[in-house]
């Protein structure tokens, strides 16, 4: 997942600022996608005070999903402390027995700077214990990192290891993982280019593995401003490159316009892309059952071919992934249905998936989460803020 400020129209690319209502809708959609194993905050709602935004975002995810929730972006010690408290309430985990309530990401400033405020928050949460930390550098080749991919990956590696070394110095044994976000640059404009084949992610995953660290790398990326053919081929190529290295986590789902915005349709299409890419990199069975010679003889001799065999019925679904929105019917049926494209199908699918009710949290947990937000707001002196109970009541 990413962390974007805007909602984009999938056909025109026009932007508007994301709201708390958008965060709720997108969380509900992500919960119901088949390839979304972990949920993290996708948008920064502008109608929430910035100092409290991670807390509201976590509350939204907790109310909308019972999947594992990754922590939102953290900038201050107050945010980090409150998120850990909220996650402990939701999960019941406290770090004992190797089970942790949440992971929190901390970003160095490239090149090779550990910012004071973020570093203080990272140290405080590590010394408190009971949390997993991700070191998340975001260098850009040719601007905040060298232009050569090898050199840029080496700098990024040093930035991650600096964070790891600091964590293990102040709180030995703190679980930590590797979050590379190295991006390319368009030499014609100087803008960040997200649609290029991101081969650096393979290098990053291998470097992380060499150090014994789990890796969260980017996969689905694109520079396209709308959901068009460019969006599809760039995201499919980069998802495949990302998964080829076998990272522990693959990020980027739902982002459009090089990570500047998102939309529900992008999430649905990305889910279809991931269905195909995950199938492509998964090993196919070559055991005795898959290569059953008796079944081959039966199919060859049968007047109905192989379709009538139990073997075919058993394997047809696992061997041939079924798309949620991709079209596989005949041309005549497609023409008769009005020539609907994948964006239309994705919009319809998103509507179906978000029509259900929120998963919700127990009432006592919900009350405690809201009190944590209110207490944090009081300590920070934030008087004007949305009522968090409206999120739990489905009134946002």
Residue ranges and their predicted role:
Residues 1-2, 22, 31, 275-276:
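Short juxta-domain linker segments that transition from a proline/glycine-rich
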Residues 265-396:
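Catalytic-core signal marking the mid-to-C-terminal active-site face
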Residues 16-19, 115, 263, 287, ...:
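A diffuse structural propensity rather than consistent per-protein peaks
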Residues 14-248:
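Helix-rich catalytic cores of soluble enzyme domains
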Residues 204-308:
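Hydrophobic alpha-helical bundle architecture
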Residues 101, 140, 182-185, 215-219, ...:
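Short acidic (Asp/Glu) and glycine-rich catalytic loops that position anionic groups and cofactors
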Residues 1-10:
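Glycine-rich, N-terminal phosphate-binding loop and its surrounding beta-alpha-beta segment
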């Amino acid at each position: 997942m990413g962390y974007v400020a805007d909602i984009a129209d999938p056909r025109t690319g026009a932007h508007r600022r994301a709201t708390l209502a958008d965060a709720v809708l997108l969380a509900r959609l992500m919960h119901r996608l088949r390839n979304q194993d972990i949920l993290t905050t996708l948008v920064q709602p502008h109608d929430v005070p910035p100092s409290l935004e991670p807390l509201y975002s976590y509350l939204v995810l907790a109310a909308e999903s019972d999947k594992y929730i990754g922590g939102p972006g953290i900038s201050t010690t107050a945010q980090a402390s409150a998120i850990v408290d909220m996650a402990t309430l939701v999960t019941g985990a406290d770090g004992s027995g190797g089970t942790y309530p949440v992971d929190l990401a901390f970003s160095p400033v490239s090149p090779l700077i550990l910012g004071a405020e973020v570093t203080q928050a990272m140290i405080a949460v590590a010394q408190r214990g009971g949390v997993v930390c991700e070191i998340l550098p975001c260098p850009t080749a040719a601007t905040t990192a060298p232009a050569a991919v090898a050199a840029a990956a080496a700098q990024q590696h040093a930035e991650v290891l600096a964070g790891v070394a600091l964590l293990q110095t102040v709180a030995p044994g703190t679980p930590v993982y590797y979050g590379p976000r190295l991006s390319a640059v368009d030499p014609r404009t100087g803008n960040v280019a997200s649609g290029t084949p991101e081969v650096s992610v393979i290098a990053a995953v291998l470097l992380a593995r060499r150090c014994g660290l789990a890796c969260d790398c980017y996969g689905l990326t694109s520079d396209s401003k709308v959901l068009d053919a460019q969006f599809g081929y760039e995201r499919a190529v980069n998802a495949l490159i990302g998964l080829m290295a076998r990272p522990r986590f693959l990020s980027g789902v739902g982002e459009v316009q090089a990570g500047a915005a998102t939309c529900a349709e992008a999430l649905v299409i990305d889910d279809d892309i991931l269905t195909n890419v995950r199938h492509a990199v998964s090993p196919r069975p070559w055991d005795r059952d898959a290569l059953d010679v008796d079944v081959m003889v039966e199919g060859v001799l049968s007047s109905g071919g192989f379709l009538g065999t139990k073997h075919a019925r058993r394997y047809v679904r696992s061997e041939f992934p079924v798309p949620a929105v991709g079209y596989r019917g005949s041309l005549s049926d497609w023409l008769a249905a009005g020539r609907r494209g994948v964006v239309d199908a994705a919009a319809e699918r998103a509507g179906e998936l978000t029509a259900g009710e929120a998963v919700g949290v127990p009432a006592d947990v919900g009350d405690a989460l809201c009190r944590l937000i209110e207490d944090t707001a009081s300590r920070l002196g934030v008087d004007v803020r949305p009522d968090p109970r409206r999120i739990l009541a489905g009134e946002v």
